[in-house]
């Protein structure tokens, strides 16, 4: 059995393309994506990978706690939070490889993941979710908080996608790593589309260890 595989399926589950490898996978798909198409990344649970499932997305260092992560190609409103060139055209290069030990041990942005979606829950990390996302729009989804885009001088469509709380005083964002991690720095980049953004007054950060211990 190979260590990594990437496959593309249509809305009915028909296999459109696939490739696998022990260390690295490069999958070329020479067709336009259609609504309902999905990409599935398969790896041994516990693997650290560097993935780039579209050549527009920035490569992401991820931890696979589960074996299969399936993301649906965004169309319509779901596409507005992405660079318009993402998943476009009639030829695509999807890449994944095992991370080197030095990459695993190096100091890095532990939160960054340009490939995060709701379906990553319990499978592919880092993963983020929230208890409130304004009107359920992709441009205000929690995943935008960790997609690596730091442009914050407006809001709505890319490049101004963000996490929006709809003025909820009890809004919470949860960032999961899928494992215990060490950190020495926390950086928050608030949206600064004034006077639209004048709601935040303070924030409370709670760290939760694997054993459930909390530190505020």
Regions found by a protein language model. Name each.
Residues 181-195:
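A short beta-strand element within beta-rich, extracytoplasmic domains
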Residues 176, 187, 204-206:
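Beta-strand cores of modular interaction/reader domains in eukaryotic scaffold and signaling proteins
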Residues 155, 167-170, 193-216:
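Trp- and acidic/polar-enriched beta-sheet ligand-binding modules for extracellular glycan
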Residues 1-48, 53-176, 197:
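Disordered, acidic Ser/Thr/Pro-rich linker "stalks" and the adjacent N-terminal cap
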Residues 171-173, 179-184, 201:
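Core residues of folded domains in eukaryotic genome-function proteins
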């Amino acid at each position: 059995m190979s260590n990594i595989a990437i496959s593309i399926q249509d809305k009915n589950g028909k296999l459109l393309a696939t490739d696998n490898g022990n260390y690295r996978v490069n999958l070329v798909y020479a067709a336009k994506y259609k609504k309902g198409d999905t990409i599935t990344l398969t790896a041994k649970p516990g693997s650290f990978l560097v993935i780039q499932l579209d050549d527009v997305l920035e490569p992401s260092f991820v931890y696979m706690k589960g074996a299969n992560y399936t993301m649906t190609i965004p169309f319509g409103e779901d596409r507005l939070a992405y660079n318009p060139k993402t998943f476009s055209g009639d030829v695509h290069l999807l890449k994944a490889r095992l991370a080197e030990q030095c990459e695993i041990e190096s100091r890095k942005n532990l939160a960054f993941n340009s490939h995060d979606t709701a379906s990553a829950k319990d499978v592919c990390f880092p993963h983020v979710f929230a208890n409130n996302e304004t009107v359920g729009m992709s441009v205000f989804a929690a995943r935008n908080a960790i997609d690596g885009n730091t442009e914050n001088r407006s809001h709505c469509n890319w490049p101004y996608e963000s996490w929006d709380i709809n003025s909820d005083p009890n809004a919470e964002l949860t960032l999961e790593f899928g494992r215990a991690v060490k950190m020495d720095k926390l950086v928050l980049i608030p949206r600064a589309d004034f006077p639209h953004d004048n709601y935040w007054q303070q924030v409370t950060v709670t760290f939760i260890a694997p054993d459930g211990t909390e530190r505020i």
